[in-house]
């Protein structure tokens, strides 16, 4: 399925010295976002920093949202994950895309100019109408069982 998403380049280096975000393969779900920083930066252990991507998007469809997700290699190998765990970009947001990076490791990490720091996935969104009830219609096997209710493994 092809869809159009409006974007603005906020950093003039994007598409020139810094590669434009793109899908790595035909089957990639996530578009890699790059660090549009002036100079390489160190993220100290336990530190969280906001990193600009050099662009803004406007989805312009309440049936869509963008999710910013960590890159698996950065998280697994270096402990670099998103400070907010998942970034949610609403369809009516038009501001700069920023990535909150958190170094959860015990080693400092050097972010280089133009480095792939997160990935963006466009997802469908439903906005259901909620109906207040006194009791739910059909009881389920799980019922009100919450955290850990279905077993330990």
From Swiss-Prot:
Q: Where does substrate bind?
A: 71-73, 84, 88-90, 98
Q: In which pathway does it act?
A: Pyrimidine metabolism; dUMP biosynthesis; dUMP from dCTP (dUTP route): step 2/2
What are the record keywords, sorted? Hydrolase, Magnesium, Metal-binding, Nucleotide metabolism
Q: Which cofactor does it need?
A: Mg(2+)
What is an example of a GO molecular function annotated in this UniProt entry? magnesium ion binding
| EC number of this enzyme | 3.6.1.23
Q: Which residues form a coiled coil?
A: none
Q: Which NCBIfam families match?
A: dut, PRK00601.1
What is the stated purpose of this protein?
This enzyme is involved in nucleotide metabolism: it produces dUMP, the immediate precursor of thymidine nucleotides and it decreases the intracellular concentration of dUTP so that uracil cannot be incorporated into DNA.
- Protein name in UniProt: Deoxyuridine 5'-triphosphate nucleotidohydrolase
Q: Which organism is it from?
A: Hydrogenovibrio crunogenus (strain DSM 25203 / XCL-2)
């Amino acid at each position: 399925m092809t869809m159009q998403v409006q974007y603005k380049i906020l950093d003039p280096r994007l598409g020139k010295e810094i590669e434009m975000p793109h899908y790595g393969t035909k089957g990639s779900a996530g578009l890699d976002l790059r660090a549009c920083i002036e100079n390489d930066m160190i993220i100290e252990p336990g530190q969280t920093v906001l990193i600009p991507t050099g662009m803004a998007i406007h989805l312009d469809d309440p049936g869509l949202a963008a999710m910013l997700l960590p890159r698996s290699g950065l998280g697994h190998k270096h402990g670099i994950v998103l400070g907010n765990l998942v970034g949610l970009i609403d369809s009516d947001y038009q501001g700069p895309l920023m990535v909150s990076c958190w170094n959860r490791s015990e080693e400092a990490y050097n972010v280089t100019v133009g480095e792939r720091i997160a990935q963006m996935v466009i997802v469908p969104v439903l906005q259901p109408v909620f109906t207040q009830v006194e009791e739910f219609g059909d009881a389920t096997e799980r019922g009100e069982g919450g955290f850990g209710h279905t077993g330990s493994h």
